[in-house]
Design a protein with these regions (language model features):
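Short phosphate-binding loop-to-helix
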Residues: 3-62
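Conserved beta-strand segments of alpha/beta enzyme cores
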Residues: 15, 99, 167-169
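Structural signal for conserved beta-strand scaffold positions within catalytic alpha/beta enzyme cores
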Residues: 18-19, 44, 73-74, 102, ...
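Short, surface-exposed amphipathic charged segments that create phosphate/polyanion-binding patches used
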Residues: 31-35, 87-90, 187
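Short, high-confidence coil segments that cap the C-terminus of an alpha-helix
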Residues: 39, 67-69, 166
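Conserved core of the sugar-phosphate nucleotidyltransferase
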Residues: 52-145
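Conserved alpha/beta core of the MobA/IspD/sugar-nucleotide pyrophosphorylase nucleotidyltransferase superfamily
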Residues: 119-193
């Protein structure tokens, strides 16, 4: 929905599909243009995650093929309390089979009676990596599902799928997101390139 981004992308040869600025999320944008694209599976790399490695995208495609789960996403281990407590880092609670149970900006699960500074030493916590894979039918259903209270409360688009009974399979990656969510993140990213 940004002409500035579209101009830069066209400048390096990317094919650009503009979306309605009223689209509330990347998933809504993907759903709005999917009819112009061929394919059974769609990858959505969030705009604030510019350093996603191609092998992670390959791993998501493989997980989709292996499991048949219509939704896949990636997670990485959170190693420190600072990231765990940051609301800009989306946390993922995973089931034993790798399915995502919940996404939250809060540190979940809560370890009762343990100081939060010790939580990452006591159990694994997972950060969401801003990339999704959807099969065609599931992505097409997204706008019809309607927004949910959970999605609005956390401001996380993926909660719409969970609230409607759909599941995400997760891929664990050693990639640690370099998301650009704050001015400080942008400054750090500029130093990387």
């Amino acid at each position: 929905d940004s002409e500035e981004v579209a101009t830069v992308a066209r400048g390096f040869g990317a094919e650009v599909m503009m979306t309605d600025p009223a689209c509330p999320s990347g998933t809504a944008r993907m759903a709005s243009v999917m009819d112009r694209l061929d394919g059974d599976f769609f990858l959505n790399v969030q705009g604030d995650e510019p350093f996603i490695a191609p092998d992670l995208l390959d791993a998501l495609i493989s997980r989709w093929k292996e499991t048949g789960c219509p939704l896949v996403t990636a997670v990485s281990r959170i190693g420190d309390a600072g990231r765990l407590l940051a609301t800009s880092v989306v946390k993922v609670v995973r089931a034993e089979n790798g399915e995502a149970i919940y996404f939250s900006r809060s540190p979940v699960p809560h370890l009762r009676g343990v100081d939060p500074s010790e939580w990452t030493a006591r159990r694994d916590y997972w950060a969401h990596v801003g990339v999704y894979g959807y099969d065609r039918a599931t992505l097409a259903a997204y706008p019809r599902l309607g927004a949910t209270e959970l999605e609005a409360a956390e401001s996380l688009e993926q909660l719409r799928f969970l609230a409607h009974g759909m599941t995400f399979q997760t891929v664990v990656t050693g990639y640690h997101p370099v998301a650009i969510d704050t001015p400080e993140d942008l400054e750090a990213a500029r130093k990387m390139v």
